[in-house]
């Protein structure tokens, strides 16, 4: 989501927040496709696909989608962080907007508490989200911030990040020992960004939050988004059958691109 109109393509309006939407059924899936398509529309796209809240409201049709917000990189935490004096009023307005767009039974608030040791703000944020939920009578769910499947995959994730930012794990560790800031520091300091077991989730979240999370599963129907391939009719030249013609094209391509270039 962009904070201002997504038509405004300026550095000041380039900051985006995460926004999660699930399709409850096949109609919701088609609606989700419309949202993704519109976010990639050149009129809205700026550095990344995005929509403003007003544009989102224009695109969403019916009550076939589920949405939740509360991840550290999402809209509500951003409002809380940037507006310490009047965040509650802004958050209340946002929750009302989301319930109007998706339906009050289809919008949830989200808590994440899997990495309180290295991310102490998680607990403070979750308490504010729970308070907001009580005021707005909104159900609260719980999720892990899973970037890899198993806890032992943390090292592989760190190596992948090092590859992306063109550095080495040795260099990252040295900088952290020297007290320097490093990109994606939470992933290098913690191994908690995996899919927690039900028992692990129960240790850090309330029973009600876990039940509400399971409720989302029961709200979603099973549906198939895969269609059979739709191939256009194609006539092969010289009355060849498709297998013969494909074989001929492969041989011609091999002769033109490979055979003549072999030392």
Give the role of each language-model region:
Residues 1-263:
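Phosphodiester-processing cores and adjacent nucleic acid-binding clamps
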């Amino acid at each position: 989501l962009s904070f201002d109109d997504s038509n405004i393509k300026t550095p000041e309006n380039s900051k985006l927040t995460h926004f999660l939407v699930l399709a409850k059924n096949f109609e919701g899936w088609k609606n989700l496709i419309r949202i993704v398509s519109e976010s990639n529309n050149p009129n809205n796209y700026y550095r990344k696909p995005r929509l403003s809240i007003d544009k989102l409201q224009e695109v969403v049709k019916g009550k076939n989608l589920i949405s939740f917000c509360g991840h550290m990189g999402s809209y509500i935490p951003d409002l809380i962080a940037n507006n310490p004096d009047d965040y509650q009023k802004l958050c209340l307005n946002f929750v009302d907007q989301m319930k109007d767009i998706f339906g009050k039974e289809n919008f949830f608030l989200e808590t994440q508490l899997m990495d309180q040791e290295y991310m102490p703000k998680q607990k403070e944020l979750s308490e504010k989200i729970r308070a907001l939920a009580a005021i707005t009578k909104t159900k609260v769910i719980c999720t892990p911030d899973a970037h890899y499947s198993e806890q032992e995959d943390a090292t592989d994730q760190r190596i992948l990040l090092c590859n992306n930012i063109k550095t080495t794990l040795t260099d990252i560790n040295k900088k952290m020992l020297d007290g320097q800031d490093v990109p994606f520091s939470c992933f290098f300091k913690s191994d908690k960004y995996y899919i927690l077991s039900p028992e692990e989730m129960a240790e850090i979240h309330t029973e009600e939050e876990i039940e509400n999370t399971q409720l989302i599963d029961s709200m979603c129907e099973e549906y198939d988004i895969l269609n059979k391939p739709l191939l256009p009719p194609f006539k092969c030249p010289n009355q060849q059958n498709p297998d013969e013609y494909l074989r001929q094209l492969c041989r011609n391509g091999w002769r033109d691109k490979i055979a003549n270039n072999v030392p």
